[in-house]
Amino acid sequence: MKAIVVKPPKPGVEVRDLSQVIRHGSGTVKVRILENGICGSDREIVKGELTTARPPEGRDWLVLGHEALGIVEDSSDPRFKPGDLVMPINRRSYHGKCLNCLVGRPDFCEANEFVEAGMVGMDGFMVEYWYDDPKYLVKVPKDIADIAIVAQPLSDLEKSVEEILNVQRRFIWTCDDGTYNCRRSIVFGTGSTGILISLLLRTVGFEVYVANRRDPLESEAKITEEAGIIYYNYSKDGLDKLKSMGFDLVVDTTGASASLIGHEVEMLKPNGILGLFGFPSEGELTLRYDVIQRFIYKSNAIVGLINGQKPHFQQALAHLAQWKVVWPTVAKSLITRVVDVNNDKELLQVLNHKERGEIKVKIKWS
C-alpha cells in the first residue's frame, strides 16, 4: 500500500510501500483515497520546520497529509455506503478529557491533548486507503467533487468568521438593515488563506479589502473583481491611508513579521476586532502606550483563529456549492495545479515548494 511518509522533526519525504493497515478510532469505514491537498503545514513538516510535528507513539515515521477526498469502499455504519464521497476531519480528540472534546470540539481542547492527522501524533491521509471512524467523516456532494478539497482549509476559516461574529455579539454589530453590509473589513495577505477568508466575508456581506505588498497577480485580479473585493498595494499606497480609513474588522493571514500587527491595531474603528490567523515568522510587536490607550478606549478586541471542526466542514462544502453558481470564475480558480501521485519529480517539487499564485494544489491518486 503506497503512502507518502515523513520522519519529523527530521526533514525529508519519501513514497513508501506500507505493510500495515492505517486505522483510526473504530475504523468501521474503509476509505480509498482519491486526492490530497497540500498546504504550508505539509511543507513545513517536509522541511523539518514544524516543531510541533510528531509521529504516532512507538515509531519514528508519520503518514503525511491532512487534506483529503476519498470514496467509501466498505462500511458497517449505516450512515455511509460504498461509493459515497467523504472528507476526513483532521483534528481529533486524544483522551477526551475536557468538555469541549467530549462534545466534538477538540479545536477548543482545554487539556491540550489532541491529535492532528498528518501532523501531530496521528497518521495522515496521503495513503492508498485507510479505515476510519464515521464520527470524523463528512459526506461530499458529487457536484462539487472537483473543488471539494478546498473545504478543509475553508473549514478553518468558516470557524474563524463564526468566532469573530460570536465575539462581536458583545454589542449590536449588524447594520440598521440587519445585515453586515455597512461593515468594512480588510484582510492582509493574498495567499490561499487570505483569498478564502475574503470570499467568506463577502458571502456574509462585508465590504472587503485585501492587502499585499505588491500589485495583484492575474489570478488574484480575476477573483477579486468577480467577488467585488478591493485590492490594496500597501507598499505603493502606504499603511497610513488604511489607518485613516478605519476598519471594523482586520484579519492578518500573512505569517510575516509581527511588526505588521502593530500597524493593524491602529486601523481598528471603535468596537473593531483584529483576527490573527497563522503565525508570524519573525520580528517583534511593540505598542506605544497611547496606542494601547486608544485600543482600550475604543473597546477593541484581538482574537486568535485556528482549526475548524465537523460543522465547519459542512458549512465549507455548502459555500463551495454556492460559489460555483454565483462566482464561477472564482470557483474555477481555486485549484491551481493537479499532480499525479506517480510523477515522483512533480510530487517532490510541490511538497517542497509553493508556487507563485498558488491557492490549492491537488495530488491525484486515481
Swiss-Prot record:
Regions annotated as coiled coil: none
Annotated residues for binding of Zn(2+): 39, 66-67, 152
EC number: 1.1.1.47
Superkingdom of origin organism: Archaea
GO terms for biological process, alphabetical: non-phosphorylated glucose catabolic process; protein tetramerization
Binding site for NADP(+): 212-214, 277-279, 305-307, 354
Catalytic activity line of the entry: D-glucose + NAD(+) = D-glucono-1,5-lactone + NADH + H(+); D-glucose + NADP(+) = D-glucono-1,5-lactone + NADPH + H(+)
Keyword set, alphabetical order: Carbohydrate metabolism, Metal-binding, NAD, NADP, Nucleotide-binding, Oxidoreductase, Zinc
Pfam family, one: ADH_N
Binding of substrate, residues: 41, 90, 116, 152, 156, 307
Cofactor: Zn(2+)
Gene Ontology MF term list: D-glucose binding; glucose 1-dehydrogenase (NAD+) activity; glucose 1-dehydrogenase (NADP+) activity; NAD+ binding; NADP+ binding; zinc ion binding
InterPro entries: ADH-like_N, Glc_1-DH_arc, Glu_dehyd_C, GroES-like_sf, NAD(P)-bd_dom_sf, Zn_alcohol_dh
Record carries keyword Oxidoreductase: yes
SUPFAM superfamilies the UniProt entry points to: GroES-like (SSF50129), NAD(P)-binding Rossmann-fold domains (SSF51735)
Similarity-based family: Belongs to the zinc-containing alcohol dehydrogenase family. Glucose 1-dehydrogenase subfamily.
Function: Catalyzes the NAD(P)(+)-dependent oxidation of D-glucose to D-gluconate via gluconolactone. Can utilize both NAD(+) and NADP(+) as electron acceptor. Is involved in the degradation of glucose through a non-phosphorylative variant of the Entner-Doudoroff pathway.
Annotated protein name in UniProt: Glucose 1-dehydrogenase 2
Organism: Caldivirga maquilingensis (strain ATCC 700844 / DSM 13496 / JCM 10307 / IC-167)
